């Protein structure tokens, strides 16, 4: 009550924010005539003067914002014949401040972005503009380049079809770079697999504007970007698990604590999980021919069965995936587009391939990964635009520290949003939708029908064909024509069926004749789990004050109502005595549906938050490794000093491990053990004479001294610059291989950590502890394994000169095979044994045992 009184007197927080921006808009408007009277050259010079002040740090961006926005507005008029409205200036200020600007469809977000882009590009550090697909990235860059070019800025576009690093690097070197979220993220991961700073394509993460920010930072937050390579694991288990899954009976969950679940397994649609019952475990063990399905030996088999049951019971063909050219291709649940090149992780994709009886592709191992959440949080300043953000304002604030500001429309929205119509069955609902389409089509009013899946869009397509109503279908199966189909959706008599938010980012324009007919009619055929997606569908009509209508048709058989809210609504319908074919239209019911959506949104938010808590652990490790890797790539980094410190640390580790071992009773056994270890790990022969009568600390110092001398002697045959390069590349190879291995260990840890809760332990706390231990092991192995490799590799000067070039070639080949796949092969060891009493091969004239047969190199492995 008090909050509503407060709002009535003082306005909402958003109203107060907008009022603050309006004061500055008046100041920008006051400058319009000043810049209007300048010639093109004078306007350009004025801009250069401001740019110089920024680069010399004489002024801040905030101090020149009014002038720069006024200049950009003037340039927009001259180059594009487009003038930024006052509300667009507000949007520009919101973006510059690192916030999210919520702007309705048709309010010109593409033009708004030019204001903060130009302002922030003046620092010379680069600005990135992120869109959801290649089409929009290319379109926006081309449309707005006239403004940027006038002001002396270069514009680059990153497209998925560009295969060369050179093209990407050129785009990133531009002042302003447009591209998709996937390409930006993958370029970052690929950069951190390169062997030279010069090969990297990205520069620093300075300022980014994410278009359709809710789609990228919310909808796709649970989908990490992964670069992977193949594993050597067998695929037979998936075929067997699929056969077993087909023989298991679906049951019902227990309704009371005393009751047991029925059947072999229970499906939890709400949380999208499968629980195998005791009866199901016994049946599976019998079918697999194993004694204990959940023993350590059968852990992979149990996991494959779990994925097979998910594939059969939670994933529908033409809803979650399609079959194209005998391959399982994912359908993006938020856009309805095919996710070409993407695969479900954790063996789920293999389970779907087994289910559909197509070729099962190799399981992949993660080589590098990052979530969008953590990628975009790397930018010094992050901003976003969308038509729908307020419903997720809490998540944006808590996870990204982003405030949402709703920008007023330039012209009030004239669209009529009608209450939902709810039917008992889907069949009744389908018939009602077709009747409504026929009515609207008869008078020429264009209709856009939104469906939640490809399967549903095909149902409506077939029904419209029977009714002989001409129409277009836009779904993942024909997304190539997306923009063209959506552009025509506002024409008189047009009927368009679109999966979910397909065609987002493309405006639907209507002419005066259509306006007179009531504008575009949006029909939603079921509510999405998120209110935001429904609002996006409604928002396709009523752009820039155009008339329009929207209405959702629902049934009690729709997934949302069936899983999350059907009983209450069903009871209302039964009390009202609703007959077959009849519907109810009531604000109470609409509110009940919205409450069901809030439940789901809350579940998804917790899921994303939970994912981030786990990924934050891995992210800190990733940042540490990538920062260290970048240090190694820096030619100024003193790697030799690092190696010498590693030698001292390795000597301490080895001597402590052996000489403080209570099982080894005397110094002779201690030395023999040390000798074997050093011989095996470092390819060196230790001489007992060098270690006779030495205490533990003296042994450690002596070992360190010998290793240091051998290392320096080995590298002295090569020019200093070449030696440092070889050390750097060998170190990087070890780091990369161990990091990949570590990611695999982390995946295994994450998969099983949830079971700790049965032991009254917090899985997240346990994950943090264990991942920390794994990481400390990784750091130690990087230091010690790189040393071992250095001691095991022998070079001639000629080999050293060719080494770097070959290593770069191998790494490029490796990166090009990842999915990107490929694993480097180790060269064969060439071992040369010299008898101890023979002349030493070094040419000193001494016997081998008195020269290099003393404590020193034992054998050489040619790189």
UniProtKB/Swiss-Prot annotation:
GO BP annotations of the record are: intracellular protein transmembrane transport; protein import; protein targeting; protein transport by the Sec complex
State the Gene3D superfamilies in the record: Helical scaffold and wing domains of SecA, P-loop containing nucleotide triphosphate hydrolases, SecA, preprotein cross-linking domain
Q: Key word Protein biosynthesis present in the record?
A: no
Which molecular function GO terms apply here?
ATP binding; metal ion binding; protein-exporting ATPase activity
InterPro entries found in the cross-reference section: Helicase_ATP-bd, Helicase_C-like, P-loop_NTPase, SEC_C_motif, SecA, SecA_DEAD, SecA_motor_DEAD, SecA_preprotein_X-link_dom
Under catalytic activity, the entry for this protein gives:
ATP + H2O + cellular proteinSide 1 = ADP + phosphate + cellular proteinSide 2
Cellular location(s): Cell inner membrane; Cytoplasm
Which PANTHER family has this protein been placed in? CHLOROPLAST PROTEIN-TRANSPORTING ATPASE (PTHR30612:SF0), SECA INNER MEMBRANE COMPONENT OF SEC PROTEIN SECRETION SYSTEM (PTHR30612)
Q: What is this protein called?
A: Protein translocase subunit SecA
Q: Which organism is it from?
A: Campylobacter lari (strain RM2100 / D67 / ATCC BAA-1060)
